[in-house]
């Protein structure tokens, strides 16, 4: 969609929210079967807060994530938003960084982004997918 021509429909609505995300222990992989212990991860990288920043202006919904989200998710999220009459803008690097979030079926793939940057283990792909779908479904238009 050409977002430069998106118009606000009806009365302008402005909403903001922050959703804290609960993650498991960090599991930074060094090799297929070797991971840094959570205490070592924290001593090297510190505590890593995780959250979504949400802003809605009229029918435009902005969701910003602490995790770098794989583009594989975007098509389904955009379709869901369009069903609700919303224009979705998803961004990452919102002030914290929790690594790369991929669909769970790609967790063991041999891609360097998935291996080295997937810091909190399997299960986060489905978790983030559900979270963002919930945000879209709860947005008003």
Language model features by range: what are they?
Residues 1-141:
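Non-catalytic substrate/cofactor recognition surfaces at enzyme active-site rims
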